[in-house]
Curated annotation (Swiss-Prot):
GO terms classed as biological process: ribosome disassembly
GO molecular function: ribosome binding; translation initiation factor activity
UniProt KW Protein biosynthesis keyword: yes
Species assigned in the record: Pseudomonas syringae pv. tomato (strain ATCC BAA-871 / DC3000)
PROSITE patterns cross-referenced by the UniProt entry: IF3
Gene designation per UniProt: infC
Any one of the GO CC terms: membrane
Protein name: Translation initiation factor IF-3
Pfam families found in the cross-reference section: IF3_C (PF00707), IF3_N (PF05198)
HAMAP family: IF_3
Cell compartments where the protein resides: Cytoplasm
Amino acid sequence: MIIKREMRQDKRAAPKAPINENISAREVRLIGADGEQIGIVSIDEALRIAEEAKLDLVEISADAVPPVCRVMDYGKSIFEKKKQVAAAKKNQKQIQVKEIKFRPGTEEGDYQVKLRNLVRFLSDGDRAKVSLRFRGREMAHQELGMELLKRVEGDLLEYGSVEQHPKMEGRQLIMVIAPKKKK
């Protein structure tokens, strides 16, 4: 299916504020380029002031009576807003859920390696999902799996707290541990 370019709308495009001649009000409350209140003036007077300053007249609040307009460089303000949004997005930390898989018969050496990885995940600020998979006849001894997860919980007390207590999902016993908040 072919969609014409004019028909497509960019969902990311923010609704643009009316500027200059696109402002429909007859009178506006005007704010100058340096932020000072000029007062209520006619739209023609506001456009003249903006033109003298070689800037744009931008409608800030259409809901107010009369609408609030400001004299500013519209292109520059859009650029600054985009820059702020990009900086805020960059500073967000994505919390991930890391998973470590155990078996009911996990030996001590393997247990220590997996525990070390869990400590690293929690120290990095990620949540950890501990899953214990049962195969075949191991399902008859689910208490061994519960003991193992209780041991993991006890060993990780200083690094995190249990967010989701152990529960069975099919043939797996699953527990989620959240990192402790850093002070």
